[in-house]
């Protein structure tokens, strides 16, 4: 976001109308970006910072699709949802294959490069979007936040998004937060990018971030 602010004139960006959008790990990063302030996570240099500093990483809208919000809690979440471990293992074989030779037992630990079961309380706070929400956000300074999650997600339990919604609603109010749970949508479900859902997303951005050109499922690049 620092870099986007720095090149705003070159590309015609309006720094007062930034929305940040992420799915899964990107959803986590979107929330932590929108909830942190310019004094946090500022140790990583970006191109042009010496010439253009100070610039802000502030965003006006956060779009979080099924992001993980609390490391080390997913096993408890799935137990609460009564989803057997073998079912989750079968559903996430594609992820397990990716970490097979890394030395980590689960995707969370691989992503953090540390066994999440050994995280200290300070480390949990440092990595948790919920911590930065409680620390930094108020009704006056909070971005608008859209949270979408599927109730058939076997990679990130939807209870993570429910807790995020509950915390945000308490701290910044219902006017700033919109949460939708999609029935029978799995992790990274293609249905989220149907023309109907993209139309709803466009309406949300038009309402909260300013006019957005039409986009459809065929024009979205997903990494």
Q: Where in the sequence are the language-model features?
A:
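Primarily recognizes the serine-hydrolase "nucleophile elbow" in alpha/beta-hydrolase
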Residues: 2-79
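Aromatic/pi-system hotspot detector in well-structured domains
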Residues: 1-6, 66, 141, 145, ...
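C-terminal catalytic histidine-bearing segment of alpha/beta-hydrolase fold enzymes
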Residues: 143-151, 155-223
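Active-site catalytic pocket residues across diverse enzymes, especially alpha/beta-hydrolases
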Residues: 8, 37-41, 82, 124, ...
């Amino acid at each position: 976001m620092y870099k986007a602010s720095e090149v705003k004139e070159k590309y015609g960006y309006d720094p007062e109308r930034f929305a940040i959008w992420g799915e899964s790990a990107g959803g986590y990063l979107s929330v932590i970006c929108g909830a942190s302030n310019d004094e946090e996570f500022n140790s990583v240099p970006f191109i042009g910072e010496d010439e253009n500093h100070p610039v802000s990483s502030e965003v006006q809208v956060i779009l979080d699709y099924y992001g993980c919000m609390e490391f080390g809690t997913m096993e408890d979440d799935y137990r609460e949802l009564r989803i057997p471990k073998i079912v989750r293992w079968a559903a996430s074989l594609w992820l397990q294959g990716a970490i097979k030779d890394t030395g980590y037992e689960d995707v969370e630990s691989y992503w953090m490069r540390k066994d999440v079961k050994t995280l200290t309380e300070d480390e949990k706070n440092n990595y948790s979007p919920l911590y930065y929400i409680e620390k930094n956000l108020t009704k006056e300074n909070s971005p608008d936040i859209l949270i979408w999650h599927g109730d058939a997600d076997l990679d990130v339990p939807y209870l993570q998004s429910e807790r995020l919604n509950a915390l945000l609603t308490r701290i910044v109010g219902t006017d700033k937060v919109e949460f939708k749970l999609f029935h029978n949508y799995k992790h990274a479900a293609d249905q989220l990018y149907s023309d109907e859902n993209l139309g709803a997303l466009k309406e949300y951005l038009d309402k909260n971030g300013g006019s957005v050109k039409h986009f459809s499922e065929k024009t979205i690049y997903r990494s």
